[in-house]
UniProtKB/Swiss-Prot annotation:
The lineage of its organism: Eukaryota, Metazoa, Chordata, Craniata, Vertebrata. The gene is OR8K5. Keywords: Cell membrane, Disulfide bond, G-protein coupled receptor, Glycoprotein, Membrane, Olfaction, Receptor, Sensory transduction, Transducer, Transmembrane, Transmembrane helix. The keyword Signal does not apply. It comes from Homo sapiens (Human). Residues 47-54, 121-139, 218-237, 293-307 are cytoplasmic. It is found in: Cell membrane. Pfam families: 7tm_4. This is Olfactory receptor 8K5.
Amino acid sequence: MGQHNLTVLTEFILMELTRRPELQIPLFGVFLVIYLITVVGNLTMIILTKLDSHLHTPMYFSIRHLAFVDLGNSTVICPKVLANFVVDRNTISYYACAAQLAFFLMFIISEFFILSAMAYDRYVAICNPLLYYVIMSQRLCHVLVGIQYLYSTFQALMFTIKIFTLTFCGSNVISHFYCDDVPLLPMLCSNAQEIELLSILFSVFNLISSFLIVLVSYMLILLAICQMHSAEGRKKAFSTCGSHLTVVVVFYGSLLFMYMQPNSTHFFDTDKMASVFYTLVIPMLNPLIYSLRNEEVKNAFYKLFEN
């Protein structure tokens, strides 16, 4: 029995999103549409904000990188989910699982701090409009994004290497529909308390630090809006922040719901719903919420097709 438990794994089995056969085809169609909208929407945002000189501003610089992260996050997860709807056995190879974990962590952690950088950008735009381009210089924008990518890559590689250099034993069934660190830890033969502690510490740090930046930025924005004498100015300020605030609430809410509940109350179905939201639904909604209703983006879109 012990020899069997220490057998080197070559593949994992992922849990299904649903075990009801009649829902397989409808869900495949839904997730295919979600993924196609995600790819088209985010690629459009990347191309428009790169090609149109009117969109070469700090705000659209952040939106371009958010679109890149959303596209990457969705592409890491969704194609495998779609494949699992049409195969009898939902397997993923050992190295593919490691790669999926690394890229997923890199993209999801990057999104935390891109959203917080966008909150700071909105704070500067509303509270210091005359100094906006001085404070949010091109150099600062590149430094902020560079630090985010370096930090997220470091953390993704650290957890992936730590987990996949240890031995897995027992069942090869991952209690999730993609490779994440939380469901992989109980499958390790050796004591995973160190990795589990690091996972909790980094998760809490990522959540709290990025959320505090968002919270403080919006508190200062709210104070500035309350001091505005013009109703038109207040309306414009609220419309500027409304889209970002909506996505922040949904994104952080789904993550908090999944990771901050006690282990004893974790249910696979509720975790699946939260995961679907921040890995598949939010990447689809972000380009729509942030930008496709924006007149500057619409003008850039029409200009691109006219040329």
